[in-house]
C-alpha cells in the first residue's frame, strides 16, 4: 500500500519537475512573432538534451536516495511487524496452552476437593456410626451391669428376708410355744408379723 502511494507521489513530482523545467527554459519575449514563438517557446536541442540529462540525474537520485531507501525501510518495517505478529501468535499459543493447563489443574483440584470432602464425609459417618455403636455397647453393658446388680441386690435382699422370716418364724414359734396361743391369736400374730416385714 505504501509502495504504490510513494510511487504515485514520485511520478507526480517528477512530472511537475519536467513541466517546470521545460517552462523555465522557455522565455516569452515581449514581442510575439511567429518565428520567435516557435524558437523561443520550444527550447533548442542542446537545452533539451541538458534538461533531459538533468531530469534523468534527478530521477536516478530520487530512485537511489528516496525510493530504494524508503522501499528498504518499508520492507524492514514489514518484516519487523510480521515478526511481532508471529511473536504475538506464539505468545498467544503459549498463553492458551497455559490457560488449558490451568483449567485442567483447576478441574483436578476440584475433583480432588470433592474426593476429599466425600472421604471426610464417609469417615465422619463411619466415626459417628462407630461412636454410636460404642455408646450403645457401653449403655447396654451399663444396663446389663445394672440388671445384674439389681438381681444381686434382690438375691441379697431375699436372703436377708428369708433370714428374717426364719428368725420371725422362730420367734413366733417360741412365742406360741410359750403362750399356748389359740388359733385366732395365732393367725393374728402371723398377720402382724407379715405387716412388720413389709
Swiss-Prot record:
Keywords for the protein's UniProt record, in alphabetical order: ATP synthesis, Cell membrane, CF(0), Hydrogen ion transport, Ion transport, Lipoprotein, Membrane, Palmitate, Signal, Transmembrane, Transmembrane helix, Transport
Major localization class: membrane
Family note: Belongs to the ATPase B chain family.
Protein's name according to its UniProt entry: ATP synthase subunit b
Record lipid sites (S-diacylglycerol cysteine): 26
Function, as annotated: F(1)F(0) ATP synthase produces ATP from ADP in the presence of a proton or sodium gradient. F-type ATPases consist of two structural domains, F(1) containing the extramembraneous catalytic core and F(0) containing the membrane proton channel, linked together by a central stalk and a peripheral stalk. During catalysis, ATP synthesis in the catalytic domain of F(1) is coupled via a rotary mechanism of the central stalk subunits to proton translocation. Component of the F(0) channel, it forms part of the peripheral stalk, linking F(1) to F(0).
UniProt GO molecular function: proton-transporting ATP synthase activity, rotational mechanism; proton-transporting ATPase activity, rotational mechanism
Signal peptide extent: 1-25
Annotated transmembrane regions: 45-65
Subcellular location: Cell membrane
Keyword Repressor: no
A GO-annotated cellular component: plasma membrane
PANTHER family registered for this protein in UniProt: ATP SYNTHASE SUBUNIT B, ATP SYNTHASE SUBUNIT B', CHLOROPLASTIC
Membrane topology, from the record: Single-pass membrane protein
Species whose genome carries this gene: Mycoplasmoides gallisepticum (strain R(low / passage 15 / clone 2))
Lipid moiety-binding residues (N-palmitoyl cysteine): 26
Subunit-structure text: F-type ATPases have 2 components, F(1) - the catalytic core - and F(0) - the membrane proton channel. F(1) has five subunits: alpha(3), beta(3), gamma(1), delta(1), epsilon(1). F(0) has three main subunits: a(1), b(2) and c(10-14). The alpha and beta chains form an alternating ring which encloses part of the gamma chain. F(1) is attached to F(0) by a central stalk formed by the gamma and epsilon chains, while a peripheral stalk is formed by the delta and b chains.
Coiled-coil residue spans: none
Amino acid at each position: 500500500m505504501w509502495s504504490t502511494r510513494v510511487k504515485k507521489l514520485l511520478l507526480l513530482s517528477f512530472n511537475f519537475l519536467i513541466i517546470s523545467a521545460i517552462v523555465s527554459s522557455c522565455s516569452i519575449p515581449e514581442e510575439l512573432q511567429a518565428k520567435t514563438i516557435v524558437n523561443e517557446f520550444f527550447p533548442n536541442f542542446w537545452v533539451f538534451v541538458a534538461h533531459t540529462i538533468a531530469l534523468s540525474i534527478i530521477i536516478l537520485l530520487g530512485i537511489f536516495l528516496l525510493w530504494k531507501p524508503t522501499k528498504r525501510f518499508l520492507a524492514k518495517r514489514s518484516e519487523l511487524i510480521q515478526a511481532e505478529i508471529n511473536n504475538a501468535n506464539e505468545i498467544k499459543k503459549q498463553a492458551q496452552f497455559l490457560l488449558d493447563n490451568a483449567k485442567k489443574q483447576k478441574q483436578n483440584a476440584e475433583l480432588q476437593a470433592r474426593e476429599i470432602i466425600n472421604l471426610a464425609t464417609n469417615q465422619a459417618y463411619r466415626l459417628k456410626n462407630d461412636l454410636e455403636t460404642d455408646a450403645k455397647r457401653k449403655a447396654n453393658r451399663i444396663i446389663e451391669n445394672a440388671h445384674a446388680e439389681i438381681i444381686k441386690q434382690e438375691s441379697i435382699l431375699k436372703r436377708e428376708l428369708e433370714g428374717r422370716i426364719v428368725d420371725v418364724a422362730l420367734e413366733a414359734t417360741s412365742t406360741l410355744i410359750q403362750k399356748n396361743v389359740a388359733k385366732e391369736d395365732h393367725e393374728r400374730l402371723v398377720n402382724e408379723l407379715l405387716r412388720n416385714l413389709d
